[in-house]
């Protein structure tokens, strides 16, 4: 990837296809369970907390946190996505707790007057030309004792998905970019590299989850055993924090605490 992806051209389609789907619902269920655990580890004496939702799209997760009484700075490269987020936040009666900033994550420090308590950085790195420095810059904005929540498109999940779909030559060719898939990231990140970047920035990893460890690999329903959507969610919740399933998730969510 030669430049960062801006979703101005497909913001409405992105919102519908990503957030308004079963896949999006599974993602929110798992990540919110993690965030509840994360928030319990933050200093609850400090209320409200200041959250940075970096590249936050429609701010689905940070709105859940805002409902608990906390303040959020939401930034995004896409002005169209920010407008959609503002409408959604206003509809939910949370606009007073938000500050919306039209900015890439790489320069968000210019809009912050002090370190934040928590950074959310979800499903952004796989769309960036240089994900490592972007992540490192955001980690630098967290106060000592603060937390970070990072979700990224998993390279191992991308390999496995292509293999089970029979796209074996594509995998053997190292999965070159295919322009026709606008809503699907074309490159995954290696989990071990992302973990290293976080730890090198002075953070201790507190937990990890695989997002959609099973649902994306299930084939044609006509040839499958019978189950309900609720069963699938229960399966994901049961195994998403256990290896080897965790490392086969289409996304991986990792959260960490900055050392004092």
Model-based region annotation:
Residues 132-147:
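A short glycine-rich, Lys/Arg-flanked "PGG" loop and its adjoining helix->strand segment in the class I
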Residues 185-202, 208:
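Short alpha-helix
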Residues 120:
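A conserved beta-strand element that flanks and buttresses the S-adenosyl-L-methionine
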Residues 1-57, 60-64, 92, 147-174, 219:
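Conserved class I S-adenosyl-L-methionine
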Residues 60-107:
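Class I SAM-dependent methyltransferase SAM/SAH-binding core
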Residues 207-260:
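A C-terminal cap/extension of S-adenosyl-L-methionine-dependent methyltransferases
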């Amino acid at each position: 990837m030669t430049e960062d992806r801006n979703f101005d051209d497909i913001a409405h389609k992105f919102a519908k296809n990503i957030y308004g789907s079963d896949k999006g619902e599974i993602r929110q269920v798992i990540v919110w369970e993690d965030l509840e655990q994360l928030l319990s580890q933050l200093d609850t004496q400090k209320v409200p907390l200041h959250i940075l939702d970096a590249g936050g799209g429609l701010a689905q997760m940070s709105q859940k946190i805002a409902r608990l009484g906390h303040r959020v700075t939401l930034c995004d490269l896409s002005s169209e996505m920010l407008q959609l987020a503002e409408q959604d936040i206003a509809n939910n009666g949370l606009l007073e707790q938000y500050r919306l900033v039209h900015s890439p994550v790489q320069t968000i420090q210019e809009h912050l007057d002090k370190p934040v308590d928590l950074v959310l950085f979800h499903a952004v790195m796989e769309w960036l030309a240089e994900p490592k420095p972007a992540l490192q810059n955001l980690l630098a904005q967290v106060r000592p004792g603060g937390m970070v929540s990072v979700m990224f498109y998993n390279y191992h999940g991308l390999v496995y998905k292509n293999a089970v779909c029979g796209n074996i030559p594509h995998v053997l060719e190292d999965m070159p970019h295919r322009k026709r898939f606008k809503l699907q990231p074309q490159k995954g990140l290696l989990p071990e590299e992302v973990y290293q970047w976080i730890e090198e920035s002075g953070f201790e990893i507190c937990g990890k989850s695989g997002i959609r460890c099973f649902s994306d690999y299930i084939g044609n329903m006509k040839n499958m055993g019978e189950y309900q959507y609720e069963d699938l969610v229960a399966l994901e919740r049961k195994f998403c924090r256990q290896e080897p399933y965790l490392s086969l998730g289409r996304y991986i969510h990792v959260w960490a605490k900055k050392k004092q």
